[in-house]
């Protein structure tokens, strides 16, 4: 439902379907995390279960790496191979292709105006297109540093500093989510995603997938914060905190690569 609604945001029912799907996803994640937390508090997990969780998190991030790597690799191919080819900058054959098929196309990036397409009517300036992702990158980097620092304080049983740095990291993560949502929906409103061909298709896939991961990771951090305030998360059993740090750092690295190669 979430994917179907996201692909039809321009329709009247599209945002409603996307919100229903997002609500269902959050409900399922919350139910699973709460169940795991209750089982952990009841002492039902042993070293073998801890090892299983760690391997599960590893394979989850490994699969995410290939998914995001495929998306970023495809746009790198478009940027450095396809775009120069249709602009006639890749040898004699590409010059002939450019002359016969797309004589008016000029190489540019980001590829907001693909060959044989009308220019997208955009209220976004090129400066805004790059500035907002840069601001988000800085916010994510700061939140990742604070989250790592919070993990360090938890390990050394400095729970007050752990709560402070974790709360700040969550606040920065929420700020990223708000700015990114604004950015995503204004790209839609400005027709950049709808009328930019392959670049627009890539943006909706990459930004949407990354945004979903941020929402899920923030939910994870909220539950960790709640457990710390209840004095139920201690230095002796930090896997849940380790998993949150790994996931958040992974999303920061993905956004850094996306910023430098996409925008």
Residue ranges and their predicted role:
Residues 1-263:
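...captures the hydrophobic TM-helix bundle architecture rather than a specific catalytic motif
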């Amino acid at each position: 439902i979430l994917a179907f609604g996201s692909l039809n945001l321009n329709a009247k029912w599209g945002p409603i379907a996307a919100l229903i799907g997002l609500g269902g996803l959050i409900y399922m994640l919350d139910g699973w995390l709460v169940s795991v937390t209750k089982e952990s508090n009841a002492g039902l997990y042993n070293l073998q279960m801890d090892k299983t969780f760690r391997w599960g998190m590893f394979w989850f991030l490994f699969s995410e790496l290939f998914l995001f790597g495929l998306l970023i690799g495809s746009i790198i191919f478009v940027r450095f191979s396809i775009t120069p080819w249709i602009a006639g900058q890749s040898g004699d054959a590409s010059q002939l292709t450019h002359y016969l098929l797309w004589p008016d196309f000029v190489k540019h990036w980001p590829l907001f105006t693909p060959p044989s397409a009308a220019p997208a009517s955009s209220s976004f300036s090129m400066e805004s297109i790059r500035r907002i992702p840069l601001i988000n990158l800085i916010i994510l980097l700061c939140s990742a540093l604070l989250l790592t620092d919070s993990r360090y304080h938890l390990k050394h049983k400095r729970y007050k500093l752990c709560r402070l740095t974790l709360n700040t990291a969550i606040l920065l993560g929420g700020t990223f989510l708000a700015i990114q949502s604004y950015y995503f929906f204004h790209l839609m409103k400005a027709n950049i995603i709808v009328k930019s061909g392959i670049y627009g298709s890539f943006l909706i896939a990459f930004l949407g997938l990354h945004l979903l991961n941020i929402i899920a990771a923030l939910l994870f951090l909220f539950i960790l914060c709640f457990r710390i305030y209840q004095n139920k998360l201690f230095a002796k059993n930090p896997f849940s905190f380790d998993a949150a740090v790994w996931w958040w750092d992974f999303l920061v690295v993905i956004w850094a690569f996306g910023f430098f190669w996409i925008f």
